Amino acid sequence: LLDHQDYVKSQWGYYYMVGSNGALMTGVVSWQGSLYYFDPSSYLLKTSGSVVSGNSAYSVASDGKLTLLTGNQAFLMIIKQAAIDGWKKYGVLPSVTAAQAILESGWGKSTLATEAYNLFGIKGSYNGQSVTMLTAEYGSSGYYYIYDQFRKYPSYYQSIEDHGYFLASNSRYSNLLWNRNYSTVTYLLHEDGYATDPNYASSLNSVITANGLTSWDYEAFNS
């Protein structure tokens, strides 16, 4: 066994990363000042395309080196699988989940998203973890601000998974589960009291169409 982490080439020409305990490493691995990604199933070095790991997205060069991606497309890459899994597990439409995350977190740039990985503004605590922040509410006299407690998550994936659970476990949202029409789902979200903003449904619809998010729905339906 090796007594240190090393990058090795097999007799068949495949590259692997071996840990100091002799076990093959997977996921994002740092080696000689660069990041690489080793597939969790095959253990092989990825040498093309892009990859998502945790709360980060990367482009992959032909030599396997990773470059961190930023911006809106990177955010979509990071949340896509969790949104699709939310349909499979809870019946929450992926396009709507993504639009809510985009709208409510400002593409993951809100203070709540960056400090607590909370993409949906869900209040309360998650496994005992929470943060207190200033939030805008809408009432009969318009918008006003209050301090409230919000759930704190270890990652975006848990935030999206909890969003699906939140909707599925609250009976008032049962009418939107497993519905395949995004405009119906966004309408019901507002009618059921998810948000107080009178333009909430139309704002979600605009985000969905602008970013082609219905393609995620079809991918979920066919997977």
What are these regions (language model features)?
Residues 68-223:
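Catalytic cores of secreted/periplasmic lytic hydrolases that degrade extracellular macromolecules
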